[in-house]
């Protein structure tokens, strides 16, 4: 008689994905972020569900309902701060996961990589709409500024913006639909993540050496189940420490003022995890050009499989590419800093140089470095 996990239709799927899955024997802790992203998604859906029970998506009630959650609902303050900071944790794990993929050449699994990019877009859309819901000053003006960018699209832009707003400005209709979309999108993300996993399991995981590991596989359980569990415990400990001691560190003080269409905040800026893209947007003095650069700053990830010129998949033994990779990481940190600064010298020129460097490293320097490293290996 076969054991249940191998015969039961449902258990069989779980077994193939999480128990008997053959995994490379040498994958490092950088491979933990997939499971950590799953944990983040579960935390966000669970905390979001409880927040939605008490939240009201009406312009006159939204701000008060969030205050009510924090003051009157049992542990409402905790649920709210877990949800708000959970988004930051989500993006930290997401960016580290993408960085790992770039460093170790995981983008060569094209289907998995492209679905990952779709997941990134979905997550960014969800986070943006979630930021609008508390209906504070930065919520309102962030929504106004970012949705207004679509008006730069020739011919259909203005109509498109008014269609998204449901009127001639960000108002009740906008808030209601953003709440509806913010509620449904995480479930779409969860479904897309399943497809992401499906394609990953077609090829098997990459490994730090970037070489086929078919000759040396180990079962996912117990080795990587416990490794993932350890990662989850460490991340949860750090996350809860942050939530309980510094809940407002990453938030904007302006969002504690109710939305006021007649009063513009001095510096309109998104949450920290969008600042790098916001800096790229602002570094181009033309509206349409800025919007195109903003979209391309994420879409450029899709070009990685086609720009890979090196004979080796991983950057582990490619020092020139390593140097460029860490320059790219530093450049993204500079862009994040610039995105939070006012539009004045010297920040404007720093942002423009950092934006040019961002695209240059990905589109020009990394492919050239790969070719140089191929030549060096032949000597």
From Swiss-Prot:
Coiled coil: none annotated. It holds the Pfam family Cytochrome_B. Heme b b566 binds at residues 97, 196. It is a multi-pass membrane protein. InterPro entries: Cyt_b/b6_C, Cyt_b/b6_C_sf, Cyt_b/b6_N, Cytb/b6-like_sf, Cytochrome_b, Cytochrome_b_C_euk/bac, Cytochrome_b_N_euk/bac, Di-haem_cyt_TM. It comes from the Eukaryota. The cytochrome bc1 complex contains 11 subunits: 3 respiratory subunits (MT-CYB, CYC1 and UQCRFS1), 2 core proteins (UQCRC1 and UQCRC2) and 6 low-molecular weight proteins (UQCRH/QCR6, UQCRB/QCR7, UQCRQ/QCR8, UQCR10/QCR9, UQCR11/QCR10 and a cleavage product of UQCRFS1). This cytochrome bc1 complex then forms a dimer. Heme b b562 binds at residues 83, 182. Heme 1 (or BL or b562) is low-potential and absorbs at about 562 nm, and heme 2 (or BH or b566) is high-potential and absorbs at about 566 nm. Its cofactor is heme b. CDD domains: cytochrome_b_C, Cytochrome_b_N. This is Cytochrome b. The chain crosses the membrane at residues 33-53, 77-98, 113-133, 178-198, 226-246, 288-308, 320-340, 347-367. Belongs to the cytochrome b family. GO terms for biological process: mitochondrial electron transport, ubiquinol to cytochrome c. Binds 2 heme b groups non-covalently. It is found in: Mitochondrion inner membrane. Component of the ubiquinol-cytochrome c reductase complex (complex III or cytochrome b-c1 complex) that is part of the mitochondrial respiratory chain. The b-c1 complex mediates electron transfer from ubiquinol to cytochrome c. Contributes to the generation of a proton gradient across the mitochondrial membrane that is then used for ATP synthesis. Its main location: mitochondrion. A ubiquinone binds at residue 201. One of its GO terms (molecular function) is metal ion binding. Keywords: Electron transport, Heme, Iron, Membrane, Metal-binding, Mitochondrion, Mitochondrion inner membrane, Respiratory chain, Transmembrane, Transmembrane helix, Transport, Ubiquinone.
